[in-house]
């Protein structure tokens, strides 16, 4: 086909996303605000690795915590294997990511006295409570909510 004859713009074509875990569903839900999305998964839609994650999501949410403390904890716990700029990026963006999940209905365990009303835990290597969780099945809770939202979105085909 002659490229000059192609009148279809890339913006009018659906975006194909491979994978139905946290990353794939997040991208799909955001892109579906303005275009059609197709999600493909090699196994069943409920069989992503996201659903198996138990612990929680780390974030700088408490005013007593800081990005610098989070980065320091991550680098120290990483025994020389952590790229500091990557750890810093994650620490800087973590609160926004957790806010997005909360805004999308993820049922994190709550604590009225906790930062943003969330119950935070402290796990190995962390100097502050900074792990938001949904009981002991955080990944499952996140995956179920985002998958249900994707199934309900008319711009997303699964």
What do the predicted segments below correspond to?
Residues 4-6, 41-158:
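Conserved N-terminal/central alpha/beta ligand/cofactor-binding core
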Residues 14-39:
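N-terminal Rossmann-like FAD-binding beta1-loop-alpha1 element of flavoenzymes
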Residues 1-5, 24:
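A generic local structural motif
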